[in-house]
Amino acid sequence: MSDSHARLERLTSMLRRRGVILPAFEIHGGVAGLFDFGPIGGRLRRRLKNAWLEHWSSHGNIVEIDSPTITPESVLIASGHVGEFNDYMSECIACNGAFRSDHLVEGFHPNPDILTADELNSIISENSIPCPSCQTPEWKSAQPMNLMFETRIGAMKGGRTAYMRPETAQGMFMLFPALYRHFRNRLPFGAVQSGKGYRNEISPRQGMIRLREFNMAELEYFIDPETKPAHDFSKWNDVTFSLVPDPEFGGPVEMTPGKASAENIIRHPTVAWFMARTWDFLVDVGIHPSKIRFRQHEGTEMA
């Protein structure tokens, strides 16, 4: 077991002992990827959520909304989730165990998330990676598996196909016309939402990092691309951020958000400003500044 996995195991064990998180439905055997928040965890989650909502709502032109967790199929077809919201799954020939292909090749590639099915198959085959359950190194070809939980709205025969939302963004985008009217047809404005999301993970692990039901908190901010924003970065003149760009464009840098915006390291001033405000929130809730970094997605990681 690696040091990072050992630390995660110790942390998860401590959280369980102290009533922060507990395995859900444990007396019936439990379900991987589902957790209860215990007496301490429930209070912590509520306080963190309230702090987050207050942090962004105090901005003035950001409002709170609450969208349904059941989403019609047509919405998720338009967003690309029905066709593309997939992880690759590898099935063991011997025991029929199913595992995420990118998890199997961790340690054999620096960024397994970006690999294609053929690349995953090659790494698994070339390294004779054993099945975590039965140790047999024989696998079927990696196949895409859609991660959304499907359901139906209405009677089963005439019901409308829908999904439990995999993220909160779609409901927020659907509300844009109403929000635009609320702000008297003027940009910029934003909306925040917190709530449940659902993903049918192939092989949940990493404690609370990969869950089948989880809590999300999201902000969407809408701007006029033709209007140059005027953000004041003076508050962060003495604060340097750890910025990790796409490796194609250079290595990590340390600089203030204002300088990063001026030098086009962060390509839009509004993005830089929200990164700075996010940094404020994280520090306010107790995260040490030295532990915070902002990493740009690589081109192959983009949704």
Residue ranges and their predicted role:
Residues 2-303:
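TRNA-recognition modules of translation machinery and tRNA-sensing kinases, especially anticodon-binding
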